[in-house]
Amino acid sequence: MASWLSAKGKVYLPPAQPVARVLETDEYITGTSLYFHAGTERLLTVGHPYFPVKDVQDQHKVLVPKVSGSQYRVFRFYLPDPNRFALIDNGFYDSDHERLVWRLRGIEIGRGGPLGIGTTGHPLYNKFGDSENPNGYRKQSDDNRQDVSLDPKQTQMFIIGCTPAIGEHWDKAEPCASPVPQPGDCPPIELVNTYIEDGDMCDIGFGAFNFKALQQDKSSAPLDVVATMCKWPDFLKMSKDVYGDSLFFYGRREQLYARHFFVRAGAMGDALPEPFEVKTDYWIPAQEGQDQNTLGPHIYIGTPSGSLVSSESQLFNRPYWLNRAQGTNNGICWDNQLFVTLVDNTHNTNFTISVKTEAADESYKYKAGDFKQYLRHIEEFEMEFIFQLCTVPLTADVMAHLNVMNPNILDNWQLNFVPPPPSGIEDQYRFIQSRATRCPTQSPSTEKEDPYKDLSFWGVDLTERFSSELSQFSLGRRFLYQSGLINGTLKRKRTINSQAPTSIKRSAKRKRSIKQ
């Protein structure tokens, strides 16, 4: 006989209040038929590829900045306010019930210069020996560091959004109060999210890691990252952003392989399992008198290599058209700004400059110490954009949504809520600047505070570089052609081949004769 029993588990009820739904920009923003082109000048930067060169007298003064092909270049483009744009007819929209915004439709990131591979390294690299093809069982000494160089992991990447890209790296964490950590103990590590700034180092094959805080020997990483950290974009976090402002779309290409295999020198912090047992599952003890009785280090590493650089695998110097972003923000540039975060170390040639210290005559013989060697790296960029003008209705639902998402948007549109009436009488002092009265309260600043004032970006002003004549620019012509706004198809003309007339012979019909 079958009987029904009620479930003994927990009963899950829906939330008492409905979950707020985030609107997509296409639900309340309407595109117009007005398109504009904007472009930059040739953007150049020159510096030392490994470290900033500082003044000997004043260490806070930087004489030559650090410019590496493995650095992030974060461009912050300032767009003109479309509600005050002179090229837009006032009758095109209702300023009392609508506001104008820019929508990104196309972008081309130009990279100048030839392809090249730039190496990095460390003059005192923690390399005990070659662990791939060893020629003997070596013993450690007090200092086994060597002068080692390598080529970094090959990376091409760009991220487009209206807010800075979010990066991640592993950093030193605060240990627990109990048990108290002892000197030499491995510190705990944690994943940290920060904005990617201009000049931050990308991963070169050693991981997204804070080398300055977690490698105290200062010899386990190349010079360009040993005193800083490497960041990697947190694509998981940015792709799950409910508003989708930091990541409209992105392009990424990575390539590397392990070229050499080394082993670290030093005392092993984590001992091998069962080190003092007579019998262990990890090795068989060596005979007496053998070098293998003293185990060597077991911290193995591989040096990265980006390998071949080819023009067939370039992400740059080609247009990208944005029809549908991966997030809820479909290319709307809130606050009239656009962030382009990129890194490209396929154009990574480092220039070696040699200068003779003293003048030489014709009988001079070469001596290496008579020449000073310098190292410089250059970066060359040029960008073009296609923007579409869009309208935002000033309805109650839209304004409430924007106020929750970013209140600065409504402030920039000069949409202020009516303040409540004063609750009572207020105090007003005479001679407020005298010492007899209390300190005057500071008047609120009229200038808008930049939310990214403490971050470093490469600012580019595009407020005077917009043009509605798209046909006068290379990217504009390609946009017009691919979008069908102009007739770019070729009509095939029908051709008739005229040949000499041919004579057609008709056979004469015979009359039928009737015999009587």
Swiss-Prot record:
Subcellular localization: Virion; Host nucleus
Cellular component, GO, one term: T=7 icosahedral viral capsid
UniProtKB keywords: Capsid protein, Disulfide bond, Host nucleus, Host-virus interaction, Late protein, T=7 icosahedral capsid protein, Viral attachment to host cell, Viral penetration into host cytoplasm, Virion, Virus endocytosis by host, Virus entry into host cell
Main subcellular localisation: virion
Annotated InterPro entries: Capsid_L1_Papillomavir (IPR002210), Capsid_L1_sf_Papillomavir (IPR036973), dsDNA_vir_gr_I_capsid (IPR011222)
Ranges of biased composition (kind: Basic residues): 506-516
Pfam name, any one: Late_protein_L1
The keyword Disulfide bond is annotated on this UniProt entry: yes
Basic and acidic residues composition-biased segments: 139-148
Disordered, as annotated region: 128-148, 496-516
Molecular function terms, GO-annotated: structural molecule activity
BP GO terms, sorted: endocytosis involved in viral entry into host cell; virion attachment to host cell
Keyword Disulfide bond appears in the UniProt entry: yes
Subunit note: Self-assembles into homopentamers. The capsid has an icosahedral symmetry and consists of 72 capsomers, with each capsomer being a pentamer of L1. Interacts with the minor capsid protein L2; this interaction is necessary for viral genome encapsidation. Interacts with protein E2; this interaction enhances E2-dependent replication and transcription activation.
Family statement drawn from the similarity comment of this UniProt entry: Belongs to the papillomaviridae L1 protein family.
Known function: Forms an icosahedral capsid with a T=7 symmetry and a 50 nm diameter. The capsid is composed of 72 pentamers linked to each other by disulfide bonds and associated with L2 proteins. Binds to heparan sulfate proteoglycans on cell surface of basal layer keratinocytes to provide initial virion attachment. This binding mediates a conformational change in the virus capsid that facilitates efficient infection. The virion enters the host cell via endocytosis. During virus trafficking, L1 protein dissociates from the viral DNA and the genomic DNA is released to the host nucleus.
The name this protein goes by in its record: Major capsid protein L1
Lineage start: Viruses, Monodnaviria, Shotokuvirae, Cossaviricota, Papovaviricetes
Name of the gene encoding the protein in the UniProt record: L1
